[in-house]
Design a protein with these regions (language model features):
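Thiamine diphosphate
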Residues: 1-15, 23-39, 63, 71-74, 87-216
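Glycine-rich, charged/polar anion/phosphate-binding loops
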Residues: 5-6, 61-66, 105-109, 158-159
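Generic secondary-structure signature for well-ordered alpha-helical cores
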Residues: 6-10, 43-47, 66, 70, ...
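Generic detector of short, locally flexible boundary/turn motifs and exposed helical patches
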Residues: 18-20, 42-46, 82-83, 135-141
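General beta-strand structural signal in soluble alpha/beta enzymes
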Residues: 20-22, 52-56, 79-81, 173
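Conserved thiamine diphosphate
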Residues: 24-71
Length: 216
């Protein structure tokens, strides 16, 4: 990965359209089945060398793969996604979503009331559905959830467009991974928004996750 996938264009002026589908998501299955080490791929990102995505809808997955072939250039695509998304009842798309549109680097909140929002949660991947269920169960229309479907190249312009609706809100990066893993250090480096960014994460850990589902 270091020798060729992330640096082939910089080193040898060679395009590389490889797609890596990496199982990633905290589902209580232990450290070997929970974490694909996204922080290590994000550390390699520079000069638009990689696409790193963690999508939340079938339509966006389709458009992501379609973009990979339709683009007039080639870049490696790193995809983080858990198996549970295949059967999640909320992870569905209409035929119209599949037939029309294009890949969305970010997806905004359609439930929260912009006039009431006090907190904005930035997240990626399946964690969105857990946050969504809690948001709707507690009727929290004062909390907005923004999905970062593509981490690199970093979609700062799209994020700014979403945050413009919530100018007085506090902004948090929320992740399932421990503080020293996941996308937090990458967000610290890349996020340039007007709203200061805070983090909600598990405590730092030497292991990606616990092996006990009850503790998880």
């Amino acid at each position: 990965i270091d020798q060729f996938i992330s640096s082939s264009e910089t080193k040898w002026n060679r395009w590389n359209g490889l797609v890596m589908l990496l199982p990633h998501g905290y589902e209580g299955q232990g450290p070997e089945h929970s974490n694909a080490r996204p922080e290590r791929y994000l550390q390699l990102c520079a000069d638009y060398n990689l696409f790193v995505c963690n999508v939340t809808t079938p339509a966006n997955f389709f458009h992501m793969m379609r973009r990979q072939l339709k683009s007039p250039f080639r870049k490696p695509l790193i995809v983080m996604s858990p198996k549970s998304m295949l059967r999640h009842p909320l992870c569905v798309s209409s035929m119209d979503d599949l037939e029309n549109g294009s890949f969305q680097e970010t997806i905004g909140d359609t439930y929260a009331n912009p006039a009431k929002v006090k907190k904005v949660l930035l997240c990626t991947g399946k964690l969105y559905y857990e946050l969504l269920e809690k948001q709707q169960k507690d009727n929290r229309n004062d909390v907005a959830i923004i999905r970062i479907e593509q981490l690199h190249p970093f979609p700062q312009t799209q994020i700014d467009a979403h945050l413009a609706k919530y100018k007085k809100a506090k902004v948090y990066w929320v992740q399932e991974e421990p503080f020293n893993m996941g996308g937090w250090t990458f967000m610290l480096r890349m996020y340039k928004g007007n709203n200061p960014l805070e983090v909600i994460a598990r405590e730092s850990s030497a292991s990606p996750s616990t092996g006990f589902s009850k503790i998880h």
